[in-house]
UniProtKB/Swiss-Prot annotation:
This is tRNA dimethylallyltransferase. It catalyses: adenosine(37) in tRNA + dimethylallyl diphosphate = N(6)-dimethylallyladenosine(37) in tRNA + diphosphate. Keywords: ATP-binding, Magnesium, Nucleotide-binding, Transferase, tRNA processing. ATP binds at G11, P12, T13, A14, A15, G16, K17, S18. It comes from the Bacteria. Belongs to the IPP transferase family. Disulfide bonds: none annotated. HAMAP family: IPP_trans.
Length: 313
């Protein structure tokens, strides 16, 4: 029996996923499962480009505003939530659409998860303190000695991934790259096949321009004030996944007095471009990928046509 197809609308940041999602919802009885590790947080709306109240009124949306910024959320939890929601949406006679750009979540849903050790808050605090003294490039050099394969694919300033790789080395007693080559953990195989409608730019420079324009629009909409509200909370700090989100960590550094606003803006745009590059690298390796030029004037119409072809009769 052929597994039931689940449609994923994916693409790099600023590719226009939200506009396409709303157009699809006008044609089919959809419910959206958001695949985004930032929009899960309450009070983080501007910098995450979270759907507005008006947009949410047009189509049911799941996995938005489900965590306080002080709380954690994992790929394993997303997988469990998404599989539950897919079944519930099917039971209502509606169509689930996975939409977003957190590629680790898609990977977890499709393939299950590797048996890696859980995060250790004390160890993370120790690594962050060392990074504050020495800089992340120094910790990247340390990682290169412990796990050369992982270090080779990470930027010396990729703080989140360097921290996680060092954490795994310490907790597991072996490199993350070795663990990733080992046995998968006991997740049941996904009962579905996944078809990815992939919004990708035909010109990188044009996407970069979009990213800069969008970041400036977020600043104009009040991003600094949004982050200021988070910054005032004593329970939030730069080590949390919420604060490490692109845009938020740069504004946090500005509010800490470490950099000026122009530098924070430049760093935020650069970090968003790097995120888009990683997203595109992952997308290009996906099976059953239908490419749609997100820069085309009729990109939304093309997405609707691709959805019509991808859905089972």
């Amino acid at each position: 029996m052929t597994p039931r197809a689940i449609i994923c609308l994916a693409g790099p940041t600023a590719a226009g996923k939200s506009a396409s999602t709303l157009a699809l919802a006008q044609r089919w009885p959809l419910e959206i499962i958001n695949v985004d590790s930032a929009t899960i947080y309450r009070g983080m709306d501007i910098g995450t480009a979270k759907p507005s109240a008006a947009e949410r009124a047009q189509v049911p949306q799941h996995l938005l505003d489900i965590r306080d910024p002080a709380q954690s959320y994992s790929a394993a939890k997303f997988r469990a939530d998404a599989l539950r929601l897919i079944a519930e949406i099917h039971a209502r006679g509606r169509i689930p659409l996975l939409a977003g750009g957190t590629m680790l979540y898609y990977k977890a849903l499709r393939e299950g998860l590797d048996d890696l050790p859980q995060a250790d808050p004390a160890l993370r605090a120790e690594l962050e303190a060392r990074a504050a003294r020495l800089g992340w490039p120094a910790l990247h050099a340390e990682l290169a000695l412990l796990d050369p394969a992982t270090a080779a694919r990470l930027s010396p300033n990729d703080s989140q991934r360097i921290q996680r790789a060092l954490e795994i080395c310490r907790l597991a007693g072996q490199p993350m790259s070795a663990l990733l080559q080992g046995e998968r953990r006991g997740d049941a195989p996904s009962p579905y096949r996944y078809v990815t409608l992939s919004l990708e730019p035909s010109e990188r420079a044009a996407l970069h321009a979009r990213i800069a324009q969008r970041f400036d629009a977020m600043l104009a909409a009040g991003l600094v004030e949004e982050v200021r509200g988070l910054h005032a909370r004593p329970d939030l700090h730069p080590g949390l996944p919420s604060v490490r989100c692109v845009g938020y960590r740069q504004m946090w550094s500005y509010l800490d007095g470490d950099i000026d606003l122009d530098t924070a803006r430049e760093q935020g745009v650069a970090a968003t471009r790097q995120l888009a590059k990683r997203q595109l690298t992952w997308l290009r390796a996906q099976p059953e990928r239908v490419i749609i030029d997100c820069l085309a004037g009729d990109a939304v119409a093309r997405t609707v046509d691709a959805m019509a072809r991808a859905l089972p009769d």
